[in-house]
Structure formats: structure tokens, C-alpha cells
């Protein structure tokens, strides 16, 4: 069974062992589960990673609830990625998530009346969530008031994040977050 009838998720390899358990590559024709996993706290890791990307793209006010439109944009973006990189676009998505997820973050601890930043390791589930959020934010920011379509912007963001390109919004955000954490050690 192939996603969108084109790409086989079984040939995709998650190279980052930390997030392997949280990136679901279950083969589905149309990535639309109707929120079946919303009842349990951490069951979102069982939803297909392509559907989670589409759900994150629906965050802005004008796209809220327009899943078919978003899935069409994701499919077009995967076509563009496939043509540009000659790779399985799901593999590019997984590599982009692995590269865009921050490994270290900052928490604020209060000692007396003073708040002190402290660097902490990021949980794998949060790394995946944050990476998906950064990729979708970068896509929405690039497509807003632009002649480029959402699909083109998503394809550019995915390819940039998969290649660790600092022009990518997701990689830029991740580096900034890790830089702050390094300063707070």
C-alpha cells in the first residue's frame, strides 16, 4: 500500500534512532485518520507522519479545517520533491524531521526571586512535534503574500531541512534554540 498511491513508506529508513519510535510510517492510501488517536495522551505517534505534517499545516486561521486542500498541497509538494531530489519524498520528510528537531532546550528555574535558564535535553516526541511545527511555520511564512504556492514552499522547506541548509526556516529556528541552550549550560 502506497501513500497517495505513489510512494512506498516501507522502503523509508529512520536513521535517527532517538525518534524512530515516534515516526510512524504505517502504509495508508489517504493519510486521514479522523482523529482516532486523539483520546490517548501520546497516541499521536501512531498517526502517519504525513498526516501529522498535514495537520500542522492546517494551523493558520485561513487553513483551519481544510484537510483535503492541505493533503492536495502535501501531495503536490511530494511530487516536486520527488522530481528535484530523485528520492522517495517520505524519506526526505523523515530526514528533514530528524535534522530540524532541536536536541537541547532551555527551561527557566526560579531560585528565590531570580529566574535562571538551564539547558535540558529534549524528549524525542517533542523533537518530532517541534520539527513538524517549524517546517509548517516556515512553509506558511514563505507562502504568505507570495506568488509561490504552498506546495512549492513546502517542497523547498523539506529539501532545505533534509540537507541541513541554514536558509531553511526550520534549521534556522533549531540552531537558534540550541545556541540559547548552549549559552545556558
Curated annotation (Swiss-Prot):
Disulfide bonds: none annotated. Belongs to the universal ribosomal protein uS7 family. This is Small ribosomal subunit protein uS7. One of its GO terms (molecular function) is rRNA binding. GO terms for biological process: translation. The keyword Ribosomal protein applies. The lineage of its organism: Archaea, Methanobacteriati, Methanobacteriota, Stenosarchaea group, Methanomicrobia. Keywords: Ribonucleoprotein, Ribosomal protein, RNA-binding, rRNA-binding. Pfam families: Ribosomal_S7. One of the primary rRNA binding proteins, it binds directly to 16S rRNA where it nucleates assembly of the head domain of the 30S subunit. Is located at the subunit interface close to the decoding center. SUPFAM superfamilies: Ribosomal protein S7. Part of the 30S ribosomal subunit. The keyword rRNA-binding applies. It comes from Methanosarcina barkeri (strain Fusaro / DSM 804). The gene is rps7. HAMAP family: Ribosomal_uS7_A. Gene3D superfamilies: Ribosomal protein S7 domain. One of its GO terms (cellular component) is small ribosomal subunit. NCBIfam families: PRK04027.1, uS7_euk_arch.
